Structures are given as structure tokens and as C-alpha cells.
A protein has these predicted regions:
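N-terminal subdomain of nucleotide-sugar transferases
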Residues: 1-47, 69, 229-232
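Conserved donor-binding/catalytic core segment of Leloir-type glycosyltransferases
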Residues: 8-11, 140, 182-186, 193-218, ...
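Short acidic alpha-helix that forms the nucleotide-activated donor recognition element
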Residues: 65-69, 134, 257, 281-294
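Nucleotide-sugar-dependent
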Residues: 20-21, 218, 279-288, 294-318
Length: 318
């Protein structure tokens, strides 16, 4: 029988009715662990929602150390280890969630900024990863391909060594795969989110859904051009972007989001064949939108971020 432990799951992302990928992953990890342990989900962002089988709340710099000192296990993601260097000496078991390869992500996030800013952003990411790799007791990732990436990183940092190898030649006890997963309950539509609700989209129109945010590493422009070509054969085709404004106010609008709107306007598609939902859809209401779609689409550029990322929103299409 598993003994109950006090577990902290820590994120920097906003915990609210509307959540992005990192917050959703932290929320679902906390929910899964809450079935057998005393779990507190902490965020340094805003928190306006309750947990489900666990406590969800905001924390701050002054309170965080005391929270960690009272925990048996800390599961963390994002830029935390380098900021709170005392975590290196913590007696808690530190589990580092590496599902977001943010050092590769930074190459795209900062792509259109001056070179010194880009180099500084990458250096900050690598400093954080170095702190995480030096201290983590267990590392999580979201796919076998990601695991290959991180084994290389761990090996270069000396974490794949005679001790860790002899303890487990598969290295699964050092780094393991925790996929994002699918909801165990079937989606149910309470009310229509798109068809017959959005002005310009009728109840019988075929809908193409872009189910996540619009970031620099995505290629919505190709999809919009395809809609432009398709409309002559399918005049009632509609494309719907599920959320343009990130729920975390610290995440700025990216250049690709601006270019997407501009192209749609230039082709005369906006409000006729292409529609933008400005605000993020509430997490619990996403089925209302997904079940109104006939096609789910995502497009990416052929670069290293695409190769090693894990597109959390696409699982909802299934």
C-alpha cells in the first residue's frame, strides 16, 4: 500500500477557468496524484479556481521556501530552480517536469528580437536547465522522442554515470515518460460553442478548428491559404481559431499571431471564412467547441522545436 505523502506541484502559469498547456498539465498531474496523496498545486501566477481532489492556490517568493520545507515531494516545471537556488539543498524529493523544452522554444519565441536579447534568453534557459539537471531526483517528459533528447542532456551533464547506470540500465528510474494523456470520460457537448452561435457560422457549415494558441513555431498561414483556395469549391467552409489571447498576461502576442490576422484580412477571409476567438476557451467548456468542429488542424514548421515539442491541445482532437 502506498504511504500518503505531502506533494507540491508547482507552476508559473495561471490557474483559472481558462488555462494554457503548462497549467493544464500541472493541474492534471495534481489531480492524478491527489487520489493517493495530499497534494497542493501552487502557482506564482494568478489562481482563481479550486482543485479537484487537491488544494490549488497561489504562492509568493516569501512563502515558497516554507511550503517546500514541509513537503516530501516537489514536482516543478519552468524557471524555478535557478531563481530559488536554495532548492539545490532541499531535503524533498525533486521531480522535474521537462515536457516543455523551453531552451529550444526560446529560439522561436525570441526569433524576431535583436541578437543580444536572443542570446540572453537562451543563456537564461540553459542556466535554468543546468540547475534542474544538477538537482533533480527524477525527470519527467512527454514522449519517447523527448526522452532521447533529455538523456543526451543528462549524459552531457554527468547524470548518466556508473551509479545511475548500475541502479537501472534502462535509466527509467532517472527519466521516465509521463504523456499528457486523454480524459478518461467521453466529451459531452452542453451547448454549441461555434455552429449557429458565432456570427457568420451557420449550424450546418463545415468547420475547421485550430485548437490552440498561435505562436511563432506554428504555421497557420499555410492553412489560411488552403482555406482561401478551398472556398471556391466549398463556399460555406469556415475556419475557427479557438483562442488568440493567452490566459497568462505575461505571455505577449507573438509575431505569428499578427501575421495570421494580416493574411486573413488581405485575402478577405476574416469574418467570412476565417474567425478569431479572442479570449481563451474555459477548460471545462472545450468540448462544446471541439464537438462543433468537423476537422481539427495544426501546422508546424520543420525545425528543432517542432521535432521535440509535445502539442498538448492536439490530443483533444482525438
Amino acid at each position: 500500500m502506498t504511504s500518503r505523502r505531502r506533494i507540491l506541484v508547482v507552476t508559473l502559469d495561471t490557474l483559472a477557468e481558462r488555462m494554457a498547456g503548462p497549467a493544464i498539465r500541472a493541474f492534471e498531474i495534481a489531480r492524478a496524484l491527489g487520489a493517493e496523496h495530499d497534494v497542493h498545486l501552487l502557482t506564482f501566477g494568478g489562481c482563481s479556481r479550486e482543485g479537484d481532489g487537491f488544494v490549488a492556490r497561489a504562492t509568493d517568493v516569501q512563502s515558497f521556501r516554507g511550503e517546500v520545507e514541509s513537503a516530501d515531494v516537489v514536482v516543478l516545471q519552468g524557471y524555478l530552480m535557478a531563481t530559488f537556488d536554495w532548492l539545490q539543498e532541499s531535503e524533498a524529493t525533486i521531480v522535474v517536469d521537462l515536457y516543455d523544452p523551453f531552451h529550444l522554444e526560446s529560439l522561436e519565441v525570441e526569433r524576431f528580437k535583436p541578437a543580444p536579447e536572443r542570446h540572453a534568453a537562451l543563456a537564461r534557459a540553459l542556466t535554468e536547465l543546468s540547475a534542474q539537471v544538477a538537482r533533480g531526483d527524477l525527470f519527467l517528459c512527454a514522449s519517447e522522442k523527448q526522452r532521447d533528447l533529455w538523456i543526451g542532456h543528462l549524459a552531457a551533464a554527468g547524470r548518466v554515470n556508473p551509479d545511475t547506470y548500475d541502479a537501472d540500465t534502462s535509466l527509467r528510474s532517472l527519466i521516465t515518460v509521463v504523456p499528457f494523456g486523454l480524459d478518461s470520460t467521453a466529451p459531452r457537448q452542453v451547448e454549441h460553442g461555434i455552429k449557429g452561435v458565432v456570427d457568420g457560422i451557420d449550424a450546418d457549415d463545415p468547420v475547421i478548428l485550430w485548437g490552440g494558441g498561435v505562436y511563432n513555431w506554428f504555421d497557420p498561414l499555410t492553412v489560411i491559404r488552403a482555406v482561401d483556395e478551398l472556398r471556391s469549391d466549398v463556399p460555406d467552409v469556415r475556419m475557427y481559431f479557438l483562442g488568440m489571447k493567452h490566459p497568462n498576461p505575461d505571455v505577449p502576442e507573438m509575431a505569428m499571431a499578427v501575421r495570421t490576422r494580416e493574411l486573413s484580412d488581405e485575402l478577405g477571409l476574416t469574418g467570412r471564412h476565417v474567425f478569431f476567438n479572442e479570449d481563451w476557451v474555459p477548460y471545462e467548456r472545450r468540448a462544446d467547441y471541439l464537438l462543433d468542429a468537423d476537422i481539427g488542424v495544426s501546422a508546424h514548421f520543420d525545425h528543432v522545436e517542432t521535432a521535440f515539442s509535445f502539442r498538448t491541445r492536439i490530443l483533444d482532437y482525438l
